[in-house]
Amino acid sequence: MKFGKTFPNHQVPEWAHKYVNYKGLKKQIKEITLVQDALFRQEQGAASQDGPARRRGRESKEQYLGHPEVKKLLAAFFFALDRDIEKVDGFYNMQFMEYDRRLRKLLSSAQLADITSVQRGATGYLHAPLPQYIAYGERERDGLPERYVPPHATDMSEDLAEVLTILLELRSHFRNLKWYGELNKRAFTKIMKKLDKKVGTNQQHSYFQARIKPLEFADDTPIVKALATINEILDRISPCVKDLQDKLRGEDRRLLQGSSSPIDVASQLVTKDDGAGLINELISMYRSVVLIPTRTLVTLLNKSALSRSFSCVDEILGIIPTLGDPSDINGRNFFHHHVIALGKKRTKSLEERDNINSLLSDSLDLEAAIPPEPNTRLVGAFGPDGVNSDDSPAPLSHILQQLPAHLRPSLLQRDNYKRTPLHYSAQYGLCEVTRIILQALSEWDAWNADVAIDDIDVWGDSENLTPLHLAVIGTHPLTVSTLLSFMNPEKSLNSPRLLHLATRLNSPSLLNSLLSAKGFDIDYQEPENLETALYVACKLDIYEAAEYLVKQGANMELGEKLFGWTPIFAAATEGYARIVQLLVDHGAKYDLFDESGWTPMEHAALRGHLDISQLIRITDNKAITRPKFATDWNKSTRPTETTNGLLSALTPSESGSTTTGSENKSSSLTPSTSNEMYALPARSSTSIDKISEPNKGNHRKVLKSQLSHGKVQTIKDTQLPQQPIKSFGHSFLQKDESVILLTLGTNDNRSTIPAVSLNKVPVAKASSTELDTALSLLVTCMDNLDAEPVMLDLPLHENLDSVTFKVPYKKDSSYTIFFDIVPTYGYSMANMNRENSSGMHSNVGNSTGPAYLDAQVGQCGSRLHYDQLGRDTPNTYDQRSRHQASQQKEQIATKKQSKILGRAVALLDSAPTSVGPNRRSIAEAITIPIIGSDTLEVLGIIRFDFLVVTPFVHKNLSVGPAETYWKSLVSTRVIGHRGLGKNMNTNKSLQLGENTVESFIAAASLGASYVEFDVQLTKDNIPVVYHDFLVAESGVDIPMHELTLEQFLDLNGERQRHQDAREAHRNHRSPNGRRLSMDDSSAELIKRSLMMRGDEDRTARDLNTIYGDRMRLTRTFKKNAFKANSRGHAIASSFVTLKELFKKIPQNVGFNIECKYPMVDEAEEEDIGPIAVEMNHWIDTVLEVVYDNVEGRDVIFSSFQPDVCLMLSLKQPSFPILFLTEGGTAKRCDIRAASLQNAIRFAHRWNLLGIVSAAAPIVIAPRLAQIVKSSGLVCVTYGVENNDPEIARVEMDAGVDAVIVDSVLAVRKGLTREAQDADTL
């Protein structure tokens, strides 16, 4: 999955609109390339009509960088890029200054000094000594020594919890901001790299150095220092926990024993509501009322209010000079503390007071994953509308009534976060407390109903959050309604974005509260992407919110900015069936084109959501249901005439738009007006996934012509010569080479276990493990011939391709793989090379120098330009090499810059469980621990599986003549399925047994150019032709690899008790001497017996009964109620080996050999056990037979098992490979086989000839055939749908190269007749 796809998923949700507009910049690059292509075609003139317009790399004369139109677009791109840089840098600086202010405030607070003695540290923050507070001991007042009252342990626990909360919150904020800067820096780097690659500029390095590297967000050093300071403080706080816990337990014992210490007496007086006694006790403690610390009075007032001790409240209000404590760590007054206490529901039971240790243990375990959790709330809340809080209004109401006038401003006082008590009541959903506060402000004439409660200038805190924002984030609909009820109903609110936030929270009641206020439009579109709240709900599968919005009349036809997608596009593409059904039931239009020319039906079908594509299927427009990309089925559409315009960009989440969106950018499709209304924009990215860009052609013109005029300019019309389908022969493994394919995680999409899982890190070890920053995974193989490790950013993307290493061939597969956890930006391969040279990490390789720094690190990694990242350039590297000694000292000072944080090691020869020679486990993910480099503790685990591809050696192994793969495939053809067709449980027509010699010969004689059959391996390693994984003819289910060839060919035959020829002939030979399957020999004996008794009429019926009874308990018979190639259902024939088939079938008949190797879910469905033949051995055995007997015959390999296909591609260059996919007709756990889209990606990556898809997605959406063709792949279909000549013709008109059918004769005749009729016209 590309960076653009995952970029939004790694963003801090509340800051989403502050990131670089990556999609928009990417689309601007696409627009530049389209102009360059057009200029190139114009320059080539008529020659461009004979082939695709393809500019050759980065030749300046082909980039047209001096052309006015290109210069104009480049200027617009850099202008937009500069604005994004300013936006990111400005936001980053503003947030950093705020967090820095909070941290410095904390470091100078009395509470922190009371908890732990923080000395002058080594970081930049502890640059000055902290104020000396005497927490426990003597202090002087007016020159006289006085005993200072030590803080109550409970107060200490509250201070500790408060300090801890601030530290963890700041730590989270700094980490989020660090990730924000790193992610944007990564985005700028990638977009500049893309500009250089696509447009041909050379701006990446210079632009980064001049415009990005000098900015604050590109240098995380201050944030690293801040995090180091926080970790240092947390390290010092941790030892205090046990001491404080002991003190709490001691106080609990004193309370139970009726202790009479002054502090305990004050607490008991508050509980008894003895106000007068409380004041007297305080006077006795502090000698005078004026000497009682304000902090003590505020704390006692809060305790009295929480205890409903109104007498104590009144007494304290009479003597307290102010409600705010100047030394308060957060600058909060009584009202702040009281509202927060109500929100957190802090009671004073002994059990809950004893939970400080659990609080710390819960809070001090820090997640090591880098990006913030997408659904993490910005602030804490304890259930909707304070359901778990103490929303008790009586104490606060009493205090507000008794509050002296000079203390009333405290209700609007702001703390260090610029929040008033109203902010906190909204945050915790205390709707009654909110009502009391607003009512009091109204009575005091301190409330202006004409000021919107979401006015940031008036109510915004330090992060521009108002009480309304906090109530929405906390999902408090009643609190929202309470806030809005005190506003002027005619006053409009200013934050329509809150509607989208409420939608993401999936709260219909919250949406209802917001929509009841003026200023919230249900159809509001966000300016950046024009997405409505309904679109967000449909895109994220938020059903309840979507249902509410639809029922409230939300416009379902408003398109977003990028491709004009309406909500039904988003839901259909993601496969959200409930959402699609909801939209269809309420009248949403689905006969629409997006800006790239595709319908929701086609998007769903491409991605394997066939149930959805049936639900929104378009049946009344021939431009969609019967496209004609080739008017003669005997002639194919050339790959150069493919839908390049429709495939030139990625999915909407990967591309962007810079144009202003219209209210509805999707075109309505009706039978009478579709051709006129449908048009593809001249410069637009596409909404269909890009598979590749091998063909830059004129197919966009062809498609537009076909949709507008119903006629396509075909090969015959243009008189173009036939072009190769694919270059003949591809790179393959030499006899001394192997390939290792590592799949991080697993290809089983049912697994929810991440590939890399890092443990929670205790705060005490955070500074030593250093897992609190952006991390990457460095995968290295010691034997890698390219000496290039692979760097992958964490968290790993979904659907990540395999990591590939080419290594020397070792018979025992004794390869070692290292998985290193390193800082994303603090680690460089230059450091790794230095470590190698010093013997620290010898596994990584010994390449040195700038060329190595700029190495391509693998197909799945990214090119490591350290100069881009503001770290190392070739010059600085040379200089550093000359001063290695000083650099080593610097490494010690800043160990993070060159440190491997953790490592896991896999020995591939012993990693999987041994299950016998030439056998393997079908599915076995390997799990290994990650060991910390310093502590040697387990930091987490890595889960992966692997495949080692060994070379195939044969005397005939060579690249054939320089022609084409399957060169005769320039005309659409019919392929016989399992010969003349697979057997079915019907008596409508006579059937030849499938996968038999007779069936293959019959198919060839009736016009099939190729015959398709299934090959499996027996126990004694002989390839045989058989379809089912389980052999059921014996009456029991036996996997093929558990039967020898002799057992298979003579299956269920009576054991020869005598060796004489007469008995052998009678029991096992037919009159013509051919070898029979047991079905035939048994049938002969039974038939003869019945005929001798005169029961000829019952013969057929009895045979069916006999064979049915024999196999009635097998899985195959239970599933299908019959068995293929069995007497009674077909003309049964003998089984055959692959070698025999080469000898018996005419040379002119091509073979489509399907390699029948089970996938994980197939093995589970058939219950064949977890053991299979080792794949290298399986394929080598089959290839051996093919190369020994091919003798010029056309041969194609195909398989549903993706690993078999890629292995066949890597082992030999002579025969093309087709990847079989069910295209969503059946659910497959292997992500590569889950959809037509993934099949195309897989086939293109491994240089396969094409795909063989189930016909269903192509029948539903015929234009998808051009998606396959545009990727340079052959498109073949199979399935019962192909037996209908009319449907087969539709597929071929759409560009399908071949159809695999059961009714060869009928389909061939139907197609021929239509072709002849077309010629006569």
Curated annotation (Swiss-Prot):
Residues 633-646, 873-893 have a biased composition (Polar residues). CDD domains: SPX_GDE1_like. SUPFAM superfamilies: Ankyrin repeat, PLC-like phosphodiesterases. GO terms for cellular component: cytoplasm. Its main location: cytoplasm. Keywords: ANK repeat, Cytoplasm, Hydrolase, Repeat. It holds the Pfam family C2_GDE1. Residues 630-698, 868-893, 1056-1079 are annotated as: Disordered. InterPro entries: Ankyrin_rpt (IPR002110), Ankyrin_rpt-contain_sf (IPR036770), GDPD (IPR051578), GP_PDE_dom (IPR030395), PLC-like_Pdiesterase_TIM-brl (IPR017946), SPX_dom (IPR004331). It catalyses: sn-glycerol 3-phosphocholine + H2O = sn-glycerol 3-phosphate + choline + H(+). GO terms for molecular function: glycerophosphocholine phosphodiesterase activity. GO terms for biological process: glycerophospholipid catabolic process. Residues 972-1311 form the GP-PDE domain. It is found in: Cytoplasm. Residues 651-668 have a biased composition (Low complexity). Its EC number is 3.1.4.2. Glycerophosphocholine glycerophosphodiesterase responsible for the hydrolysis of intracellular glycerophosphocholine into glycerol-phosphate and choline. The choline is used for phosphatidyl-choline synthesis. Required for utilization of glycerophosphocholine as phosphate source. Belongs to the GDE1 family. This is Glycerophosphocholine phosphodiesterase GDE1. It comes from Eremothecium gossypii (strain ATCC 10895 / CBS 109.51 / FGSC 9923 / NRRL Y-1056). The lineage of its organism: Eukaryota, Fungi, Dikarya, Ascomycota, Saccharomycotina.
